[in-house]
Amino acid sequence: MKQFMSVVRFKFGFTSVRMRDWSVGVSIMVLTLIFIIRYEQSDHTHTVDDSSIEGESVHEPAKKPHFMTLEDLDYLFSNKSFFGEEEVSNGMLVWSRMRPFLERPDALPETAQGIEEATLAMKGLVLEINREKRAYSSGMVSKEIRRICPDFVTAFDKDLSGLSHVLLELPCGLIEDSSITLVGIPDEHSSSFQIQLVGSGLSGETRRPIILRYNVNFSKPSIVQNTWTEKLGWGNEERCQYHGSLKNHLVDELPLCNKQTGRIISEKSSNDDATMELSLSNANFPFLKGSPFTAALWFGLEGFHMTINGRHETSFAYREKLEPWLVSAVKVSGGLKILSVLATRLPIPDDHASLIIEEKLKAPSLSGTRIELLVGVFSTGNNFKRRMALRRSWMQYEAVRSGKVAVRFLIGLHTNEKVNLEMWRESKAYGDIQFMPFVDYYGLLSLKTVALCILGTKVIPAKYIMKTDDDAFVRIDELLSSLEERPSSALLYGLISFDSSPDREQGSKWFIPKEEWPLDSYPPWAHGPGYIISHDIAKFVVKGHRQRDLGLFKLEDVAMGIWIQQFNQTIKRVKYINDKRFHNSDCKSNYILVHYQTPRLILCLWEKLQKENQSICCE
């Protein structure tokens, strides 16, 4: 996992260079960010001698009890169709089989929250669908109904003082590449102002969480960043101090605090939100009372980044359960005159209500017999653009259009009812979405992996099952050709890690405490952006979880490795086939899979394949 983290950081090294080249004056608009991917991997495939693997003892993850209400489960798994429409009911074929895997006493820590929020989300979605149906039947379809996820929102000329004001509403949240540009003038008579990203309400909480609080204090110049939830209160403050060295930690290859401003200090806040005093060099402080500034807050893969007048000032890593897709509003308090604020690159779907959907973009019908390959694409609610890029690119391979290969998106519900309504429209239009009966959280990805195994053994039986992500490009032709040379059973195929250890650094996205995995290393596992298992392994996973012989684990790709290790020792020797043409972090010619591709790059790769018939990278 450490190798994976270094790869992610390397990717964003180019972003930081581009950020330093920005020239942002006092104006309303700033340049949007371009994420560029560069890595290197050589092409090599080999089959591993697994005799040593077979002899290792099986270790199961530690089991912790987490409970949810039966009422929520009963609602989510009631017999009636929520939608009453065959097209969307077909998107719940896995959903209907998931209950036994959710109500186990050793469920993943976030399962209860994910199910509670899914119940609220589903109730809201049913109301939205019924409201839209009434609007269509009465002929009163407004632009608001047709376009509920705008690609940008803006506001101008607001004089804020004292109480907190909602500056912008963000109907469908934020995603990687989104940015918020604010032009303002601090009040000469005020000692501070705050910019807050407020989230959708969490289950069981009456007050909305603060996904990010950016507190600017003039009395003793400071920039303090933090989060807040009703349940946990304020988290650990992160603030700059002029004297001392920087912490050796980066977010998207950017420092937590600009070296010219100071060093970062992390301390626990008191619940009364008292700002701790610190000393900063006034000369380097990016804000000045009475002087206008342009602030660009943008969203990377790992965290938030703030640029003031063209200079990167602070970064703040996303905290668990407080992801950017939860953000629903921008609030400002304190003394600040707002000249303009603009949120751009927001998640938007295609307007399915006004466009005639091309037949070639719809999921083709299947014969009902076992297919060669099922590809499960892990996606989240507001990643509309990514899914459309896949539908218009590698999902157009003849093997997919003919039904030899099936591709399905596995998506959990969203806490935002508008995003869920757009997903409902999307599912109805394309027929390639399988909904999950929980709200998407990183800690629940392993449940999606189990769901994919159910899909590939019970719903769309397939000889091979592949897991990939919605920012990956897959060469279906090369993959099928390679699988012809592989065994049809007891197979794990992809970019395999044979010597990795748990990340013990608290705060890391991949942090695993010793009580969850006490060993110093993991069994062999294939990197999550793309791996293939045989039908018998998928069947073993489903049966093992139904009978609760297999434990759940937070990291889905490592979890699959743990389950396969048990298959290897109890059922049949596994062939671990490592193929370095599965690029989990870069693009290199002669690839089978490349990860971290934007929608633009996905379409570019497809165009190059069509024109040149070669797997050539775009950048």
UniProtKB/Swiss-Prot annotation:
Pfam families: Gal-bind_lectin (PF00337), Galactosyl_T (PF01762). The chain crosses the membrane at residues 21-37. Pathway: Protein modification; protein glycosylation. Expressed in juvenile leaves, stems, cauline leaves and siliques. SUPFAM superfamilies: Concanavalin A-like lectins/glucanases. The keyword ATP-binding does not apply. GO terms for cellular component: Golgi apparatus; Golgi membrane. Its cofactor is Mn(2+). GO terms for biological process: arabinogalactan protein metabolic process; mucilage biosynthetic process involved in seed coat development; protein O-linked glycosylation via hydroxyproline; root hair cell development. Belongs to the glycosyltransferase 31 family. Possesses hydroxyproline O-galactosyltransferase activity. Transfers galactose from UDP-galactose to hydroxyproline residues in the arabinogalactan proteins (AGPs). Is specific for AGPs containing non-contiguous peptidyl hydroxyproline residues. Utilizes UDP-galactose solely as sugar donor. The addition of galactose onto the peptidyl hydroxyproline residues in AGP core proteins represents the first committed step in arabinogalactan polysaccharide addition. AGP glycans play essential roles in both vegetative and reproductive plant growth. This is Hydroxyproline O-galactosyltransferase GALT3. It comes from Arabidopsis thaliana (Mouse-ear cress).
